């Protein structure tokens, strides 16, 4: 399962994670975490990869299971599984290099959960339209009763998406998201440089 530009990493749970890695002699690697229902071939990861090549740092982009061309179905995934996908891949690739995490939307949630695991190697964090806890704060708490009933009874509901296909929100995704909430918990970023960017016209 391989193509010319990308490779696949197999996790301990046998999930096949597609990734692209640019190596560098510098002891720094930039790692991009994409958002929900996104992939690693969008404008943001490609732009950051181009910039990383220009300044000659390493760069890693990848797709969680159920996203892009990685294995499994999107509806089988959740924050715990996607965090584990990211952790196993990153842990196998960075060696002793310092890392800068860049998270887009849901990617920031997953990146923030991994900062403590890589704290000795963290050099910075950049969040773009960050959406930690979105399954609870932006979805479940704002869903009307009829939608909550559908999710509880059928296990899934397709939420309208102004950017493309509907978001398939599953009961297990909501339940798992509650276990992974971080916004109301103390988080030690270990004195990291942190930059957060959010568009004023972002309706989401």
Where are these regions (language model features)?
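Short beta-strand element of the alpha/beta-hydrolase
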Residues: 27-35
């Amino acid at each position: 399962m391989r193509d010319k530009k990308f490779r696949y990493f197999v996790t301990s749970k046998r999930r096949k994670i597609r990734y692209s890695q640019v190596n560098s002699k510098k002891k720094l690697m930039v790692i991009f975490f994409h958002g929900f229902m996104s992939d690693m071939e969008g404008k943001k990861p490609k732009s950051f990869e181009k910039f990383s090549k220009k300044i000659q740092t390493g760069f890693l982009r990848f797709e969680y299971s159920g996203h892009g061309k990685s294995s499994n179905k999107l509806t089988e995934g959740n924050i715990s599984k996607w965090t584990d996908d990211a952790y196993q891949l990153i842990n196998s690739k960075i060696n002793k290099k310092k890392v800068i995490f860049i998270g887009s939307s849901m990617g920031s949630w997953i990146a923030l959960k991994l900062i403590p695991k890589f704290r000795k190697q963290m050099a910075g964090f950049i969040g773009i339209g960050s959406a930690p806890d979105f399954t609870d704060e932006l979805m479940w708490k704002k869903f009307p009763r009829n939608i909550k009933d559908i999710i509880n009874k059928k296990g899934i509901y397709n939420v309208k998406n102004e950017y493309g296909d509907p978001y398939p929100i599953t009961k297990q995704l909501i339940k798992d998201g509650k276990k992974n909430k971080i916004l109301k918990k103390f988080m030690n970023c270990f004195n990291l440089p942190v930059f957060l960017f959010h568009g004023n016209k972002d309706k989401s």
